[in-house]
């Protein structure tokens, strides 16, 4: 197997959908593995070490929300939820449990591939770049965040969100702009993605998430970096 090919784990009990996803993703140059059970998905992630997980919300064994929560306890692997539900509560629960993004069924294959590529994009040849917000230091090429020498563990998406804010400390970012820059959306989308991930980021980087100094809310507009 080509070691440069990225591996996608598809977790879905719908065999026909899983087969379609496999065909589409392999056609785009990805390796794929398919699991149809939530509990087995946890073992598969440990054994296969995928670069990204496509995770259905409704699964036998363990539902997607619980799978997401368990994975996030010790893994930063990108997770994109697949859901047929339009229920706001389920989407938000999934995001709060650690999913990076979600896509509603039915979806166009090109849209799915774009979401996957947005979560996998990484530049291994990034030049040296050190950023800071308040007392938080960010080593961009090392993908490392510290406060007073203590490392703060972030998922790749949380890291990208923090870097986007830190690179333009005077700019107030609307949610739509963050969706484009961090998630790779090219059209208006669900701004709850931004709100939930800001909450998750604050829980990790703020000394007091209720009184943030790193990621500030600009009421009626969006978010900005706190003062250095």
UniProtKB/Swiss-Prot annotation:
Localization per Swiss-Prot or TrEMBL: Cytoplasm
One BP annotation, GO: regulation of DNA-templated transcription
Taxonomic superkingdom: Bacteria
UniProt-listed InterPro entries: CheY-like_superfamily, MtrA_REC, MtrAB_MtrA, OmpR/PhoB-type_DNA-bd, Sig_transdc_resp-reg_receiver, WalR-like, WH-like_DNA-bd_sf
Keyword presence, DNA-binding: yes
Domain Response regulatory positions: 7-120
CDD domains from the UniProt entry: REC_OmpR_MtrA-like, trans_reg_C
Posttranslational modification: Phosphorylated by MtrB. Autophosphorylates very slowly. Phosphorylated protein binds DNA better than unphosphorylated.
Binding-site residues for a divalent metal cation, renumbered to this chain: 13, 56, 59
Function: Member of the two-component regulatory system MtrA/MtrB. Binds direct repeat motifs of sequence 5'-GTCACAGCG-3', phosphorylation confers higher affinity. Overexpression decreases bacteria viability upon infection of human THP-1 macrophage cell line, due at least in part to impaired blockage of phagosome-lysosome fusion (upon infection bacteria usually remain in phagosomes). Infecting C57BL/6 mice with an overexpressing strain leads to an attentuated infection in both spleen and lungs. The level of dnaA mRNA increases dramatically.
Protein known as: DNA-binding response regulator MtrA
Organism from which the protein derives: Mycobacterium tuberculosis (strain ATCC 25618 / H37Rv)
Encoding gene (name): mtrA
């Amino acid at each position: 197997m080509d070691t440069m090919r990225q591996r996608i784990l598809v977790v879905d009990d719908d065999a026909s959908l899983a087969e379609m996803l496999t065909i589409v993703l392999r056609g785009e140059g990805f390796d794929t593995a398919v699991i149809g059970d939530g509990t087995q998905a946890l073992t598969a992630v440990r054994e296969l070490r995928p670069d990204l997980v496509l995770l259905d919300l409704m699964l036998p064994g363990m539902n997607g929300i619980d799978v997401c929560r368990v994975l996030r306890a010790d893994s930063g692997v990108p997770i994109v939820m697949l859901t047929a539900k339009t229920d706001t509560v389920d989407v938000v629960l999934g995001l709060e449990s650690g999913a990076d993004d979600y896509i509603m069924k039915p979806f166009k294959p090109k849209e799915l591939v774009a979401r996957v590529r947005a979560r996998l994009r990484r530049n291994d040849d990034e030049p040296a770049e050190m950023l800071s917000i308040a007392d938080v230091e960010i080593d961009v090429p090392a993908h490392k965040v510290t406060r007073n020498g203590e490392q703060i563990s972030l998922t790749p998406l949380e890291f990208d969100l923090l870097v986007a804010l830190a690179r333009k400390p005077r700019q107030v970012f609307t949610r739509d702009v963050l969706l484009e820059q961090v998630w790779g959306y090219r059209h208006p989308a669900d701004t709850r993605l931004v709100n939930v991930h800001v909450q998750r980021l604050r829980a990790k980087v703020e000394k007091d998430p209720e009184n943030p100094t790193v990621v500030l809310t600009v009421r009626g507009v969006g978010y900005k970096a706190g003062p250095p």
